[in-house]
Amino acid sequence: MGKYFGTDGVRGVANSELTPELAFKVGRFGGYVLTKDKQRPKVLIGRDTRISGHMLEGALVAGLLSIGAEVMRLGVISTPGVSYLTKAMDAEAGVMISASHNPVQDNGIKFFGGDGFKLSDEQEAEIERLMDEPEDKLPRPVGADLGLVNDYFEGGQKYLQFLKQTADEDFTGIHVALDCANGATSSLATHLFADLDADVSTMGTSPNGLNINDGVGSTHPEALSAFVKEKNADLGLAFDGDGDRLIAVDEKGNIVDGDQIMYICSKHLKSEGRLKDDTVVSTVMSNLGFYKALEKEGIKSVQTAVGDRYVVEAMKKDGYNVGGEQSGHLIFLDYNTTGDGLLSAIMLMNTLKATGKPLSELAAEMQKFPQLLVNVRVTDKYKVEENEKVKAVISEVEKEMNGDGRILVRPSGTEPLVRVMAEAKTKELCDEYVNRIVEVVRSEMGLE
């Protein structure tokens, strides 16, 4: 991670860390790196429903206009909506203003290249290098060569048309409850499922600039769980603030996470001969029950580091078309280039419609192993991988598990923590294994 770009673009508290001044520079230098070979490059900008979105959009637009770009403002739209439209409209770049599932005071800026994919580490490094130069030597067009800005609020409709084409048939007879996190999908999701003839009940669809992700959305699925039962819905679909994640709820109110959705969809796609190489890409944090369920269905799996960008990289490299994370970032590369909550919802609904089975029955085919994750604050998180005593206790626990469990000990990507995760046959065994390892990590390198 660099000075400005983290694991998912530039993030910070809006107007404190992520200031308009910084947003201007990100627009100017980011726009230049992505479009420098083009005369009057086209750049799309979308935002979620945060109050700070207008302020940051204004600064970003100014930065892009200063390099001569033609900016098209999409208004409130999901992150995957920007990604899709950037490629579909032959734009040189796309920008999304959002901090995803984070609280309202945060915001972020995320770029997409003309191919609809997130930037490479090298591109981000070049943007940072230019931003930190003592003198701004970028071209400064004048007169008729200055940039132009236009609104293209029809972009959302174009994206919805694309999504509707991914439905195998209409959803007549399915009662779906939607939780849109008071975010970017608040209008999109409601129209999408109504247009596909589902019976729709909604919550979290009244954004006021301040209530995004506030007790609603994919990070608070318990709210949707209660709503599904209250409305007697067949299933619930919860999106996050920028619409790139999906967590579902079955008709009984049970939460169905990203691993389960991935399993359900990949099994169905395999049965139709549409799963490339019968392989799914996931991260090391996916549940052991996920891998065992895939194995039973003859589906292979590839594991990556945590982060949807690493999942996408592995998919692109070897041509796989389904991947994702337990958190609900699910990528269907035949259709879009990034995690897409609405697209994932349609893939799940396609499966429900084709099988005629309730979501609870489909989800029950994957038996989740009890999982426990404990964070330990340490002096040097990177030393955990070479500590002999830690290695010894991990080896001891793995021997006891005898293949019926899994241990993962890794440094956090963003904080001075070591994450200790175990999965085992029972919750009691899980607790015991994690506590044994945590004890050794604390005594060897823990902070008091």
From Swiss-Prot:
Activated by phosphorylation. GO terms for biological process: carbohydrate metabolic process; peptidoglycan biosynthetic process; UDP-N-acetylglucosamine biosynthetic process. One of its GO terms (cellular component) is cytosol. The keyword Isomerase applies. The modification Phosphoserine is found at S100. It catalyses: alpha-D-glucosamine 1-phosphate = D-glucosamine 6-phosphate. Its EC number is 5.4.2.10. Induction: Constitutively expressed, part of the cdaA-cdaR-glmM-glmS operon. One of its GO terms (molecular function) is phosphomannomutase activity. InterPro entries: A-D-PHexomutase_a/b/a-I (IPR005844), A-D-PHexomutase_a/b/a-I/II/III (IPR016055), A-D-PHexomutase_a/b/a-II (IPR005845), A-D-PHexomutase_a/b/a-III (IPR005846), A-D-PHexomutase_C (IPR005843), A-D-PHexomutase_C_sf (IPR036900), A-D-PHexomutase_CS (IPR016066), Alpha-D-phosphohexomutase_SF (IPR005841). It comes from the Bacteria. The active site is at S100 (phosphoserine intermediate). The keyword Phosphoprotein applies. Disulfide bonds: none annotated. It is an enzyme of class 5 (isomerase). Binds 1 Mg(2+) ion per subunit. Its cofactor is Mg(2+). PROSITE patterns: PGM_PMM. Keywords: Isomerase, Magnesium, Metal-binding, Phosphoprotein. Mg(2+) binds at S100, D240, D242, D244. CDD domains: GlmM. Belongs to the phosphohexose mutase family. Catalyzes the conversion of glucosamine-6-phosphate to glucosamine-1-phosphate. Glucosamine-1-phosphate is used for cell wall biosynthesis. Homodimer, may form a complex with CdaA. This is Phosphoglucosamine mutase. The gene is glmM.
